[in-house]
Curated annotation (Swiss-Prot):
Gene Ontology molecular function, alphabetical: toxin activity
Protein name listed in UniProt: Peptides MS9.1
First and last residue of the signal peptide: 1-21
Keywords: Disulfide bond, Nematocyst, Secreted, Signal, Toxin
Chief location bin: secreted
Record carries keyword Secreted: yes
Organism: Metridium senile (Brown sea anemone)
Annotated propeptide span(s): 22-27, 63-64, 92-98
Length: 98
């Protein structure tokens, strides 16, 4: 009786130790060579995935690494596939007046 009780306690301890040994969610987990919520672009640079993580609504004004449609911050692709600047985005009032 004593041996089976000790065996049961040891089994429970092993189960709890296994559960605790599982890795926790790591905000810096590496996916494809980049940190969480980032991917490598064509030039091999890690860029942020729009809408990933706590920023559910893309904030074009605060994150310089946000990529929208393959273009960098404050730029979008035109019908030819070229990246063109979005007027009013960022802080360049001189260019916006053009």
């Amino acid at each position: 009786m004593k041996q089976s009780l000790i065996l049961a306690v040891l089994c429970l301890a092993l189960v709890f130790a296994t559960i605790e040994a599982k890795p926790k969610a790591d905000p810096n987990i590496i996916v494809g060579g980049c940190i969480k919520c980032h991917v490598k672009n064509a030039s091999g640079r890690c860029v942020r995935i729009v809408g990933c993580g706590v920023d559910k609504v893309p904030d074009l004004f605060s994150d310089p690494n946000i990529i929208v449609g393959g273009c960098s911050k404050c730029h979008k692709q035109d019908s030819s596939g070229n990246c063109v600047r979005i007027a009013g985005c960022g802080v360049d009032p001189v260019r916006d007046a053009e």
